[in-house]
Curated annotation (Swiss-Prot):
The keyword DNA damage applies. Belongs to the ABC transporter superfamily. UvrA family. It comes from Pseudomonas aeruginosa (strain ATCC 15692 / DSM 22644 / CIP 104116 / JCM 14847 / LMG 12228 / 1C / PRS 101 / PAO1). ATP binds at residues 31-38, 640-647. Keywords: ATP-binding, Cytoplasm, DNA damage, DNA excision, DNA repair, DNA-binding, Excision nuclease, Metal-binding, Nucleotide-binding, Repeat, SOS response, Zinc, Zinc-finger. Forms a heterotetramer with UvrB during the search for lesions. GO terms for biological process: nucleotide-excision repair; SOS response. The gene is uvrA. A zinc finger (C4-type) spans 254-281, 740-766. One of its GO terms (cellular component) is excinuclease repair complex. One of its GO terms (molecular function) is excinuclease ABC activity. This is UvrABC system protein A.
Amino acid sequence: MDKILIRGARTHNLKNVDLTLPRDKLIVITGLSGSGKSSLAFDTLYAEGQRRYVESLSAYARQFLSMMEKPDVDTIEGLSPAISIEQKSTSHNPRSTVGTITEIYDYLRLLYARVGTPRCPDHDIPLEAQTVSQMVDQVLALPEGSKLMLLAPVIRERKGEHLAVFDEMRAQGFVRARVDGKLYELDEVPKLDKQKKHSIDVVVDRFKVRADLQQRLAESFETALSLADGIALVAPMDEDEDVEEIIFSARFACPVCGHSISELEPKLFSFNNPAGACPTCDGLGVKQFFDARRVVNGELTLAEGAIRGWDRRNVYYFQMLGSLAQHYGFSLEEPFDELGAEHQKVVLYGSGRENVDFRYLNDRGDIVKRSHPFEGILPNLERRYRETESATVREELAKFLSTQPCPDCHGTRLRREARHVWVGDRTLPAITAMPVGEACEYAAGLSLTGRRGEIAAKILKEIRDRLQFLVNVGLDYLTLDRSADTLSGGEAQRIRLASQIGAGLVGVMYILDEPSIGLHQRDNERLLGTLTHLRNLGNTVIVVEHDEDAIRLADYVVDIGPGAGVHGGQVVAEGTPDQVMNHPDSLTGKYLSGRKKIAVPAKRTPRDKKKLLKLKGARGNNLQNVNLEIPVGLFTCITGVSGSGKSTLINNTLFPITATALNGATTLEVAPYDSFDGLQHLDKVVDIDQSPIGRTPRSNPATYTGLFTPIRELFSGVPEARSRGYGPGRFSFNVKGGRCEACQGDGVIKVEMHFLPDIYVPCDVCKGKRYNRETLEIRYKGKSIHEVLEMTIEEAREFFDAVPALARKLQTLMDVGLSYIKLGQSATTLSGGEAQRVKLSRELSKRDTGKTLYILDEPTTGLHFADIQQLLDVLHRLRDHGNTVVVIEHNLDVIKTADWLVDLGPEGGSKGGQIIANGTPEQVAEMPQSHTGHFLKPLLERDRA
């Protein structure tokens, strides 16, 4: 069967969709945000493919696998086992790294265990165990006729007279020994100074090198090795011999200091195994510590609350500081930064063993005196963090924690022995610290000879292939030791994609969710090459995507629409890209064919050179002393290839600087920089990112945007509610009173099933409505509170048209393209892009002062061309009110409408971190060194035509 037949798909908003998709092709599903693309791809095709596969397993196996709900569809034929690769960030486990997720690290461990050469950490001498035959061969390879002696080093740098050693040697029939570098007959050895360290080597044999000595040498070596615990020396008898002293070892041990290592095993290189993990940080690579910079506000005095929790409101702690100040003679009324270094040290780290006389005023007004050392603010926090059993206290104290690389392993996570094993000229931590692109080149050029070459051949092939796949999906700037929880959703998805290609499966249905997120146009071509490679292996690749290049490259395109939410859920057009382009009803087709387009502004808003935000000397992560200038009151786009430093510059430097100064944020970490100028032009900063608006099913757009409070007030104002004495709290599902107590306002009850997935069944008391019967009897304009929460934003906008406060907030949700989501939709079901737009609408609905800095990170995630047009209207509206809008973006349709561009590069990772171009889009398009300009130029020319 060469087709996938879908009949009667009704999942979510799909309207009885019938669709026939070709197998083993690259299929792109596109359409407006909320039109039903994910419902078709993930909730219908993937859910059914995965469910059928899991159902084929035994009941015992099924209990370990989560099973998906059966989608609402009549029939699906021609399905393969399905693998979904979504944007969810991979792991919040601090032990997961890029290397471990892609399994490259497992192969590297195997490589180092099988062909690595351990070296002594102190003397840098290879710890290679040699057989007696190898030792004999090495000696016989020396110039023939060389006069040599074979020594057994029985004492190494040890104090004493060692008389017993000499007696033992004589008893065994030995005649000579080398003591502290001088040769003596055993009967003539001078008395040794027992206070000094000595070295004693017994002469086991003396010989001239010639070919027939094999047997004799072998026996002599065995004698020497047994005497000196596996170590032997060959030294010239005369100083004029042209032979250097050679050390031989029969075990993995340093011949100089005796540092030994057991046989190399892969677990020695695992930081998740006690055998390999650094004992100081347990393989995490970082140590947490209470950071004085986070605890203290140095501009305030101790009396004003320089240290949170130790001010006048906390009488007990403040009295302690008062007694401390009296003892050491400093003032509580002086800014903390101006106190002497000694006084600061005492406050932060304690008085050591020195007793301080403390005076406390107890509840009865009596003065109590005690004398004891002062613990210190930071040790006090550490102790409380360690001892507390309260999650709230721990969470509060965690705000003062910072991390630093482990002082022992320097962030490599491995124990000392594992850090000193070499393959070629690199250790394992050196390879994992390289960007993937460089590691790929290194692995390609690594050639091992002989037995090692044979052992390493297969392992190296796997490593090279997997590194190449990461390069192909545009991740050449990542390092293998990068922690997985620092990856963006797009990066995590492309890592999974690379792992899947590495698996080399055939006959599978892959379903991907916007793999081009966070990718620069230049890297996009490589990603599309990867997708076609997956297809060419013999797989069906289904991609939910808005990227123009991906749609044009597809074998088959499905356009879902025509609108969003209830107005969507139908197949508007399907076929080859050309067929969709020429379809009269396809919105996607209109944008692809150029009948509709996102226009370039006729003229750019000029910048005022006197009104600039100036950031100097930014050098976080890979930034190379960058000086950034952002025009105030304009729409600025920060562009650059993936990994060039955009997020570090804006999210980790510009945002925390401005948020700390304008919003009073206290716990944000700022990447290193020299100076910042221009705060006088701003009064607040708003960061609109893609983190969830809430992590529980109780959070929803209505609660987040502040709509729910006025809605509850409306309901409590209904005559029936007033006569019953219901206040706004009655209509909250988070507190007792009006909610259904059987499900505590959740509307569903979780039922744990053992070998089936946990199921959530509608509460049989309230039938999923969250409220009790009495609350639901109150109606506003004929609707209950439950029915209002079930409305889409569009329906609610019409319903509350006469209530200006609500209408305005609902209109802003419509303006950012969220007309299709429900007011009470659980926050956990919103995508990153949707969550970001809910946040944007909340900011839009506030009265703006025209002096706000808005920062957005890739707001076009999940947006169709028509949605992008809506978003741009909103961003330009903010700009027209005098606000400063800074957007990190790869989408060329957004970039071309910006007033000002700042392009970072030239490449990603260590080859990036510089501003290579800034100016208007037209100016950047003419700059040959800018990758962004290269792709922008033809677009501007086409749109101006």
